Amino acid sequence: MPAVQAEHWRRELERTTGAFDAAFPKQPGRRYASSRMKPYLLFRWAAEMVRNPAVLDAVEDLVGPDILVYHTTLWWKPAGSEAFVPWHQDGTYFGLAPHEHVTAWVALTPSTPESGCVTILPGTQRQGQLPHVDKPDPAIMLSRGQTVAAEVDAAAGVPIPLQPGEFSLHDTLVLHGSAPNRSAHDRIGLGISYIPARCYHTGPTRLSATLVRGENRYDHFDLEPEPQADMDAAAVAAHLDSIGRFWRASELMPEMSLVH
């Protein structure tokens, strides 16, 4: 994607998330209202990002023509921040089967080894689902500090540097993480969780997802609406409903609370 497009999205991100946070300040019991989760339900820029043809073409090569967005997370690591993400597998906390979820990580600012870009351990997806443990630490960007329990050869990690507008794809079972941001600029990117329509949530809660290509042949999820304007009443209601379902599902499947 052109760098100028990424710059436009970044400016819109800063404008709209600031407006949302001002309108809906964090309150006890409203943890699920964060604009950092599923912003594509609230903002036009994010709705455009998750439907970008270049990203969808690459995802389709991996999962087929019927594609849903299951979740997104805004990963904002401030300059000089000690925040980091430990080695983990996404499949541990998404509550999906089969393990065919693919994450597209779209950079809106330079994502480099210095700024704490995503680093993967190639081939680890072949090991299947590994056990994880909680390591509470305020610097960890996952809410419970989820870390793979197995011994990891960090020296084998391969960083994935991205310039604004570039994206990477990683498998739901590949071990990955990211280091603190030692650069002078914020590292900002959107992690988009794409799944083939045949995937389903393994818990009892009926969740929602967004159809971005093909058909919803299996009806495993209620389909989410596309926002017609930033933070209009329908968009805010759809976002609250979707995140509320996810929150309720996480109460029944505690591992899902790591996504919040």
Residue ranges of each PLM-predicted region?
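A generic structural micro-feature
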Residues: L96-E100, E151, R182-D186
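Double-stranded beta-helix
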Residues: P113-A179
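Non-heme Fe(II)-dependent double-stranded beta-helix
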Residues: M1-L96
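Active-site region of the double-stranded beta-helix
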Residues: P65, G91, L96-A97, V106-C117, ...
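Short, solvent-exposed loop/turn segments at secondary-structure junctions
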Residues: M1-A3, W75-K77, T92, S111-P113, ...
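Short, surface-exposed loop/helix-turn segments at secondary-structure junctions
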Residues: Q89, R144-A154, H185-D186, P204-L211
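Short, conserved beta-strand element in jelly-roll/cupin
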Residues: H88, G95-P113, P161-P164, L169, ...
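Non-heme Fe(II)/2-oxoglutarate
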Residues: A23-F24, L173-H260
